[in-house]
């Protein structure tokens, strides 16, 4: 984690830089840009910090402009050389007095003229965009919301190989809402919160992991917990049902059997009495 750097010494260096006629960006001033590119926090007054950014952007855009002009000149020179060679070969070749000029020569001349016009239009347009951007930047009252990205573009400008692409990239940074810079007291508080926040997040993550491990319930356990305990119903003294129990059924069956046996005994005794009476009568 990168903390916000603030010191009165750097602030004085910024103030002195603003007063210089021939400005020189020291390593200490470059460290301010590098710190903002990592934290996104501006803790120095924008009116002095803006001078540093303006100088660096103007310097970088000048580099791109010179490279663009040099590249355009090289392209034009190459085209001119090709045209000259074609013209010389056409002149050296035997031609009749009535033969017209070579069509290829006409095409090369037109291409050269179009390339010159294109380069002039592009260069004038880019220079105009550059001037408008720098003027708007110098008039800004607050740091852009994307100041972190702006610092990254200042530090890593060599990643861009095109003048137009870099100019469009920095121009977008200025068209975003602005925010006030932090005071020195707010910087101290911000750094404290960053440190305590990292410790709090690590402890919270550990607690959350432990709680999750403890309270995790498998689908089988959850299903068993949702089902009622059948034993508490089957063996509860207060449990009732509309169906007779097995004990009641067996008791009723036993009583019926005893009654039938008694009835059979009575009938047997009656039969024995009748037989005895018949035997006496025969004698």
Curated annotation (Swiss-Prot):
UniProt signal peptide: none
Region (Disordered): 75-105, 192-283
A single cellular component GO annotation: cytoplasm
Molecular functions per Gene Ontology: protein phosphatase regulator activity
Biased composition annotated in UniProt, kind: Low complexity: 75-104, 204-220, 232-257
Biased composition (Basic and acidic residues): 259-273
Disulfide linkage: none
InterPro entries: PPP4R2
Superkingdom, natural source: Eukaryota
Segments of skewed composition (Polar residues): 192-203, 221-230
Residue stretches in coiled coil: none
Family, as annotated: Belongs to the PPP4R2 family.
Subunit (UniProt): Serine/threonine-protein phosphatase 4 (PP4) occurs in different assemblies of the catalytic and one or more regulatory subunits. Probably part of a PP4 complex containing ppp4c and ppp4r2.
Purpose: Probable regulatory subunit of serine/threonine-protein phosphatase 4 (PP4).
Protein name, per record: Serine/threonine-protein phosphatase 4 regulatory subunit 2
Gene giving rise to this polypeptide: ppp4r2
């Amino acid at each position: 984690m990168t903390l916000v750097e603030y010191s009165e010494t750097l602030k004085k260096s910024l103030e002195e830089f603003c007063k210089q006629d021939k400005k020189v960006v020291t390593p200490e001033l470059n460290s301010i840009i590098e710190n903002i590119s990592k934290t996104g926090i501006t803790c120095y007054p924008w009116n002095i910090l803006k001078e540093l950014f303006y100088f660096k952007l103007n310097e970088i855009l000048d580099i791109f402009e010179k490279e663009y002009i040099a590249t355009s000149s090289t392209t034009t020179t190459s085209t001119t050389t090709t045209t000259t060679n074609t013209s010389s070969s056409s002149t050296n070749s035997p031609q009749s007095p009535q033969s017209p000029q070579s069509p290829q020569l006409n095409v090369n001349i037109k291409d050269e003229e179009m390339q010159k016009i294109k380069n002039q239009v592009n260069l004038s347009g880019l220079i105009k965009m550059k001037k408008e951007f720098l003027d708007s930047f110098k008039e800004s009252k607050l740091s852009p919301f994307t100041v972190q990205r702006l610092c990254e573009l200042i530090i890593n400008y060599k990643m861009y190989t095109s003048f137009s692409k870099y100019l469009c990239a920095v121009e977008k940074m200025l068209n975003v809402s602005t925010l006030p810079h932090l005071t020195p007291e707010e910087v101290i508080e911000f750094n404290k919160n960053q440190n305590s926040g990292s410790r709090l997040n690590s402890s919270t993550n550990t607690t959350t992991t432990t709680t999750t491990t403890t309270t995790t319930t498998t689908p089988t356990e959850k299903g068993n917990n949702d089902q009622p305990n059948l034993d508490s119903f089957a063996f509860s003294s207060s449990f009732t049902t509309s169906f007779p129990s097995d004990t009641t059924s067996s008791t009723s069956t036993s009583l019926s059997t005893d009654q039938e046996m008694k009835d059979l005994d009575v009938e047997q005794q009656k039969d024995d009495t009748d037989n005895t009476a018949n035997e006496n009568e025969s004698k």
